[in-house]
Structure formats: C-alpha cells, structure tokens
C-alpha cells in the first residue's frame, strides 16, 4: 500500500467545502481530503428519501435555490438538472392564511383595505410607513417599510421566535431584506433563477465530489484528525466550520448562533396537511415558527404526507449567526486570529460559519468560487 499525500484539507462538506474541493481537484488536478463531523455530506442542504412515505425531505429545513447570478447558475448546472420552482409562502395570521411577502392581497386581508392598483398600494405604503431620521435597529427598519399594524401582526413575534430577541434588539440588517410588493405578485422570490435540484441536494453535491482526486472522511472532527496530523503537511487547510470552534483555545468569548429543532410528523392516507409547502406562524401563542410540508416541492407523489415543524433555539447545531453589536465586535477579534493563521499556517476560513455571515446558497457558492480564484489559483501561478 502507498500513502496518498493530500495537498489540501477541507473541513466541512457543505456547499462551500464541496465547491472548493471540486475546483481544486478539477482545475489544479491536486489531491483533496474533505472531513466532516457529520455522518453525511451536504451540510445543512442534506436531503434524503423518507422510508415511510417515499418523500424527499431536507433534514435541516427547506432550501430553495434562488439567484440572479448567471455565473453560479451555469456552474451548478454542471452537477444537476434543476427544475424551475417559484416558491410561495403563507402566514397564518388572524385565523387565516395570508400570502408572504406583503403584497396588495396581504394588506387587503389584514388591514381591511380594498386596494386594486400599484398606485393605490404605493399611496397606502407612503401613508402607513413610519418615518425615522436614522434607522438604528430592525423594529425601525420593519416599521419604516410596512408600518405598525403589519409589524405587530406579522413580524414582531415571528422575529422574537426566530432570534429570541425582539427586533429592537437586532441590527437593522436582519429585516432590511423583507420584500414588499406593490402588486399582486405572491411569489416569495423575484430572482431570475428559482429552482430545486431534480434529484435533491445530496445527489447534486455527490456529483460535485466524483473527481478521482477527492477523498472523503465522515464522522471526523478537525480536532480528532489533527491529533495525528500536522498543519505543515498541507499546502492549504480550508476550514468551513464555526470560527470560534477553531479558536476555542483562545480566551475570546464564544459567538452566538441560532439553531433549529425539528419535529417530524407523518400522516397516512392524507393528500396534503396544509395548502402550501411552507406556512409561517408569527403569533406568539404558537411555539414553532413554521411548518414545512415537503410533498409540495416538485409535486411529489405519495399516498401519505410528512410535515416538519421548526422551532428556533439557542441549543443545537449552529445555523444562523446572530448579528448584533456584541457578536460583530467579537467576530473582529476572531478575524484577527484567522488572518494570522492564514499568513503563517495557510489555514483559510470560508463560508457562513467561518465568516460569521449569513449566505444564501448562491452566495455561499459564489463566495467559495471567489475564494478559490483569489487565494488558491493566484498563489499557484
């Protein structure tokens, strides 16, 4: 037997890790080892066929690919066929299902209006939006966009359930991107590309990792692996996990993350449980934030259905960075340590958890491609 010497070690096999591995193996023809502490590839995009119902389920919550980035769209189409999917979301408010994002229909149903045109909607928004000299937090951001009534009904408690903080305690960026439509368009996204991978995300990521130069070792943490290895063995180490986990030996306080708890229920001989794939529950008296019914996605066929209610939590796998001043200040300290590691040990920190930044899927892939071009390709030349 001979020992393979890997040129690059990638920690984490989510979108970021898989993209960088694919690029290094195919563009540079170099050996890559990916390790992941979980028992599966795909990070939080991992999906699987549920044995009882035959329905494709995303283990860590619904993922809809949407983007205006043609470059990334062309890239992902190398590894999967994608099916156009215009995602719609309902919110259960005042004992009825209303469409999200806020559009003319939402306003008519929740505010007893009879708006018919975009001009009328613009006038209503102008009259309703709260004016601030400077916006300092998410409550002000939201009220400046939808006014007091919709803020109270749809956003205030929903945000609290998501973050365990009221909008006034969160950076304005959290609710900056809530879409508002001045028409009847009830699609959740208005991006050029909106799609789901025909055979699921796990298959898509599997197809990214087929190159002979890529090896995979699951159920392996970075700390365990490094007990028998040395940083100097590798041309580069790409770490895509939580940055504070990597520097857990430093005396900097830990960063905050939000997690999700999932409660799965199966219903035999039921066509659909709810009218839509995703229903938000913004009211305070319901503990979960939303219910996802996966059968709706790609119009899957089954005599049964499966629904997953999602509850946000401080405990569990880190999913979302919590953007407030404390965490952003701490992250800067970690970033200084990361820059030292990059310069001295060729350890690079890339991705949502490593950059302590919320990325959509297309942004995670674009970020990984940019990293490869700037930091790996440029140093090879």
Descriptions of predicted regions:
Residues 94-101, 105-236, 245:
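Active-site/ligand-binding neighborhood in enzyme catalytic cores
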Residues 321-381:
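C-terminal catalytic lobe of FAD-dependent flavoproteins
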Residues 1-6:
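Short, Lys/Arg-enriched N-terminal segments with co-localized hydrophobic residues
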Residues 52-128:
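Dinucleotide-binding Rossmann-like beta1-alpha1 core, especially the glycine-rich loop
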Residues 25-51:
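Glycine-rich FAD pyrophosphate-binding loop
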Residues 27, 220-340:
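Mid-domain catalytic core of redox enzymes
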């Amino acid at each position: 037997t001979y020992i393979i010497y890997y040129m690059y070690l990638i920690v984490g096999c989510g979108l970021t890790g898989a993209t960088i591995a694919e690029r290094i193996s195919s563009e540079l023809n170099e050996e890559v080892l990916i390790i992941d502490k979980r028992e599966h590839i795909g990070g939080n995009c991992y999906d699987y066929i549920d044995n009882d119902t035959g329905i494709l389920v995303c283990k860590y919550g619904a993922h809809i690919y949407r983007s205006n980035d043609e470059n990334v769209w062309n890239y992902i189409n190398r590894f999967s066929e994608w099916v156009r999917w215009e995602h719609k979301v309902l919110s259960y408010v005042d004992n009825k299902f209303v469409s999200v994002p806020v559009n003319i229909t939402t306003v008519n149903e929740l505010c007893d209006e009879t708006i018919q045109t975009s001009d009328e909607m613009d006038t209503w928004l102008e009259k309703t939006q709260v004016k601030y000299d400077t916006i300092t937090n998410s409550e002000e951001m939201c009220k400046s966009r939808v006014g007091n009534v919709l803020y109270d009904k749809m956003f205030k408690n929903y945000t609290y359930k998501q973050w365990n903080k009221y909008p006034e305690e969160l950076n304005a960026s959290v609710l900056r991107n809530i879409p508002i439509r001045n028409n009847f368009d009830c699609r959740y996204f208005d991006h050029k590309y909106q799609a789901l991978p025909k055979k699921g995300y796990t298959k898509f990521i599997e197809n990214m990792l087929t190159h002979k130069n890529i090896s995979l070792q699951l159920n392996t943490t970075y700390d365990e692996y490094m007990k028998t290895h040395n940083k100097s063995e590798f041309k580069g180490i790409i770490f895509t996990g939580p940055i504070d986990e990597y520097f857990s030996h430093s005396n900097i306080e830990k960063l905050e993350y939000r997690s999700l708890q999932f409660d799965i229920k199966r219903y035999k001989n039921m066509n659909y449980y709810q009218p839509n794939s995703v229903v938000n529950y913004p009211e305070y008296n319901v503990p979960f934030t939303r219910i996802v019914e996966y059968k709706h996605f790609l119009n899957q066929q089954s005599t049964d259905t499966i629904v997953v209610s999602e509850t946000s939590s401080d405990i569990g796998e880190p999913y979302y960075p919590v953007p407030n001043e404390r965490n952003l200040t701490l992250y800067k300290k970690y970033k200084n340590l990361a820059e030292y590691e990059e310069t001295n040990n060729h350890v690079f920190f890339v991705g949502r958890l490593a950059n302590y930044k919320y990325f959509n899927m297309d942004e995670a892939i674009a970020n990984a491609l940019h990293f490869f071009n700037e930091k790996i390709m440029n140093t090879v030349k």
